[in-house]
């Protein structure tokens, strides 16, 4: 099994030059403030598919912003059973859930080649005291995590597999759109098995629903490539507008 990757300071793109800055950072940060934030950010080599960023039980000392690629977070039961808790795309922060107990309650693993920015939490906390805009941004991120947890509980309460998978696809679509990518044509970095684990469905059920969606011309799917053909109907099946 691969060990968690330790990142080191590395001379790469400044935060202000990153295409994800509008999503990742408060818009009100000036150049001097952004320099101060960039000073504490560590950027290391990309994680390979299957490599761990951190493991459940590891000490909490940093949060991470996904720069490219995708991560899954999951917890292991006492019997070793994996339960996926989320999929994380570029500009999203990972690791904040470890702040309370000072250890990570989940593991984070790369679904594909993935680059992250590591932000040591103590230094981030100190900087947030000096920059109220940054503190508010962190609070927004934590609020979003709470909202995502609530949406997940709502998702798992839906009666049908069709509703769960429609909601999952509409949510991904909104997140890709927010990042400047196509909302209707994208690649799934996660496997059908991982989708099923996340949604509480058997992998056979996931495959059947994807097939049914294609037969009903809601989507076209080939391998991990998905093309949403009827976003209005898919959104209606998901129960309305779903934000990323």
Curated annotation (Swiss-Prot):
The keyword Iron applies. Induction: Up-regulated by Fe(3+) levels in oxygen-limiting conditions. One of its GO terms (molecular function) is DNA-binding transcription factor activity. GO terms for cellular component: cytosol. The keyword Secreted does not apply. Keywords: Activator, DNA-binding, Iron, Transcription, Transcription regulation. Coiled coil: none annotated. Disruption phenotype: Nearly complete loss of expression of hcnA. InterPro entries: cNMP-bd_dom, cNMP-bd_dom_sf, Env_Response_Regulators, HTH_CRP, RmlC-like_jellyroll, Tscrpt_reg_HTH_Crp-type_CS, WH-like_DNA-bd_sf, WH_DNA-bd_sf. A nucleoside 3',5'-cyclic phosphate binds at residues 21-149. Residues 192-211 bind DNA. It comes from the Bacteria. Residues 159-232 form the HTH crp-type domain. Possesses 4 cysteines which may bind a metal ion (possibly iron). Transcriptional activator of anaerobic gene expression. Regulates the expression of the components of the hydrogen cyanide synthase (HcnABC) in a positive manner. May also act as an iron sensor. This is Transcriptional activator protein Anr. It comes from Pseudomonas protegens (strain DSM 19095 / LMG 27888 / CFBP 6595 / CHA0).
């Amino acid at each position: 099994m691969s060990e968690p990757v330790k990142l080191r300071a590395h001379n790469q793109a400044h935060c202000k030059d990153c295409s994800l800055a509008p999503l990742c950072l408060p818009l009100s940060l000036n150049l001097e403030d952004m320099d101060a934030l960039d000073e504490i950010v560590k950027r290391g080599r990309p994680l390979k598919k299957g490599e761990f960023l951190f493991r459940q039980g590891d000490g909490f000392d940093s949060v991470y912003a996904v720069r490219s690629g995708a991560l899954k977070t999951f917890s292991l039961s006492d019997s070793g059973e994996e339960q996926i808790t989320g999929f994380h795309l570029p500009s999203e922060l990972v690791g904040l859930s470890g702040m309370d107990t000072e250890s990570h309650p989940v593991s984070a693993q790369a679904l594909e080649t993935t680059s992250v920015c590591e932000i040591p939490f103590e230094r981030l906390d100190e900087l947030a005291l000096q920059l109220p805009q940054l503190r508010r941004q962190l609070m927004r991120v934590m609020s979003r995590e709470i909202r995502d947890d609530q949406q997940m509980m709502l998702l798992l309460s839906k009666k049908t597999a069709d509703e769960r998978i429609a909601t999952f696809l509409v949510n991904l679509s909104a997140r890709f759109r927010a990042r400047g990518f196509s909302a209707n044509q994208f690649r799934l970095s996660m496997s059908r098995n991982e989708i099923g684990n996340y949604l509480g469905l058997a992998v056979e059920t996931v495959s059947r629903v994807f097939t049914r969606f294609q037969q009903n011309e809601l989507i076209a799917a080939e391998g991990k490539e998905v093309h949403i053909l009827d976003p209005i109907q898919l959104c209606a099946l998901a129960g309305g507008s779903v934000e990323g």
